[in-house]
Amino acid sequence: MKVVGTMFFKDNKILIDKPRKRATYQMVGGGVEEKETPLEAAIRECHEELGPKALFDESNFELIMDFDEIATSDSSKKIHFYVYKYNGSLKGTLTESEEIEKFLWYDSSYGIDILSNTLKNEVIPYCLTNNLIK
């Protein structure tokens, strides 16, 4: 299974979202559909999760890392995760939906208990090491 996530940054914080069906925050992203590239999936998921009033340039996505991990929901399932960094400013308004309960501009002052395993184990350490968040 292939999954994508996109990192948006503002004021040394990363944008994460809280799905209504999950206890933890995750990256903006989701599954790669059949006949779709990871980049196409990342762009589609950003449109879906951020809502119609969020504005971003689709040419500003950069693949930063990819790795394998075990699915939190099913330990027998292996996931290949692609992480993109958005090189620009996210404009407009973020819109909650049936799927997404809320958004958070995260920095380390929030701690790690609210984070998905992918954020906790891979993404946030990368962001801290590269001075992308505080």
Predicted regions and their residues:
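Conserved N-terminal beta-strand and adjoining loop/helix that marks the start
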Residues: 1-14
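Active-site-adjacent beta-strand/loop module that shapes the phosphate/pyrophosphate-binding cleft
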Residues: 2, 65-93, 104-109, 126-127
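Short strand-connecting beta-turns/loops that link adjacent beta-strands
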Residues: 11, 20-22
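Conserved active-site beta-strand element of glycosyltransferases/polysaccharide synthases
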Residues: 17
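A generic "binding-loop/recognition-motif" signal
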Residues: 21, 38, 90, 111
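Nudix hydrolase/Nudix homology domain
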Residues: 23-25, 96-134
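The catalytic Nudix box helix
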Residues: 27-64
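Functional cleft and adjacent loop/helix regions within the main domain
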Residues: 28, 34, 70-71, 100, ...
